[in-house]
Regions:
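Sec/Tat signal peptide C-region and signal peptidase I cleavage site
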Residues: 20-22
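Bacterial N-terminal signal peptides
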Residues: 8-18
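Glycine-rich beta-strand-turn "strand-cap" elements at beta-sheet edges
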Residues: 24-36, 75-84, 109-145, 179-188, ...
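Sec/Tat-exported extracytoplasmic proteins
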Residues: 61-65, 69, 102, 114, ...
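Short, well-ordered beta-strand segments in beta-rich or mixed alpha/beta enzyme
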Residues: 37-45, 75-102, 142-151, 181-208
Length: 237
């Protein structure tokens, strides 16, 4: 009798688990990737002993890429406190122009030369615009560049998209902001990159502490799929 009761209890628990899993609707499929500009964010990490060589390679790649057909903006920056880490920020007219650039001889040469000194694999992420302003001139001087990778779990994609878009729309109005862009990864639409440029460190810090930014982080936290990874850089000369 006891064995029969245990068996019935096990069947009931299994049935309940099955009903629960079946009762949860799958997250909606992401929409098709739109045509138009491609925003490319690439993280480069070289050995500490090769930081100067890495900077030279990144500069050469930046300068050569600016001459490629379809290039709308190509910038490079070095991370504060970690001079062996860089970010490359590119904007291309469309996917075909980016694809052609990716096959260019100078791009292949850059990748080959970088492999000998890299600390981590070349991390390139292709995006389409979510909330961006006009394309300003390239950076320089005391400007502070913030680059943040935002990852939300797939069921929260639509909510995450709305939150990140609102942050960009609001932040472009803040004092000292020179650029605030939110872009969506083409191959994972629950992943975003936020690119922000501030007049100086004081205005960047003020934005990070204001009520709107803190409220955004509070709302995003339950949907997050990974650490909110914010990094600050200074443009390479």
């Amino acid at each position: 009798m006891a064995c029969a009761l245990r068996l019935l209890l096990g069947v009931a628990i299994l049935a309940g688990m099955t009903m629960t899993s079946q009762g949860q609707p799958a997250p909606p499929a992401p929409p098709p990737v739109p045509d138009g500009p491609r925003y490319v964010v690439t993280y480069v990490d070289v050995m500490q002993t090769a930081k100067d060589e890495g900077a030279a390679l990144v500069r050469q790649f930046r300068d050569a890429s600016r001459k490629d057909a379809g290039s709308l903006r190509v910038e490079a920056a070095r991370r504060f406190g970690l001079p062996n880490q860089f970010v490359i920020l590119e904007v291309w007219k469309d996917q075909p122009s980016f694809d052609a650039h990716a096959q260019a001889a100078h791009t292949t040469q850059f990748h080959d030369r970088l492999k000998a000194i890299q600390n981590a694999p070349y991390d390139e992420r292709v995006h389409f615009p979510l909330s961006v302003g006009p394309l300003p001139a390239s950076l320089g001087g005391p400007a502070i560049i913030g680059v943040t990778h935002v990852d939300v779990i797939p069921p929260q994609r639509e909510n995450g998209t709305a939150l990140v878009k609102q942050l960009a729309d609001d932040s472009r109005k803040d004092d000292g902001n020179l650029r605030f862009e939110a872009v969506t990864q083409t191959n994972r639409q629950n992943h975003f990159t936020v690119i922000e440029v501030w007049k100086n460190r004081k205005t960047a810090d003020a934005h990070s502490m204001n009520a709107k930014t803190r409220a955004f982080r509070d709302k995003l936290a339950p949907a997050s799929g990974a650490l909110y990874d914010q990094r600050f850089y200074k443009a390479l000369d």
